[in-house]
Amino acid sequence: MSKVIRIAVLVDTSTGWGRRVIRGIADYATKQTGWQLTVVESGRDEKLALGRGWQGDGVIARIGDLEMYRELKAFGKPVINVSAIELKGVDFHRITGDVRTAAEAAVEHFAQRGYEHLAYCGLEDLQYVARHCEAFEAAAQARGFSCEVYHPSQRQGQSGW
């Protein structure tokens, strides 16, 4: 009998992005022998953490702050970071999407539908959102399209609209 490999998945379950990441991990895990996933449910502003005493073999996590990094580092097992957030000193292996290719695909999607005047909306004070915005603007400009940018306020209770 093969050994069961226990993997914790610490990804925000309240967002479409997080659920798609979990779906991708689960799809991969079903093709492996002996993988057992523990998905830690959480909302957007909730702290993602391993339960006390969890005895696993590794973690796949969206590491968004140094506190989480330190906790997972102390765990002493392999960790894969799926966050686009770049934190100084975080040295786990990281898997993220290709921002440039995604931006080019988005611009191509609009181009195929006849749009030439595009816009990007995102919270500018989030570094990974800024990278997405820059890539989208560059892809639009490379096609000769105009691109407006709107950065709504992130302050709680203020929609920015």
For every predicted segment, state its role.
Residues 1-58, 68-161:
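Bacterial carbohydrate/catabolite-sensing allosteric modules
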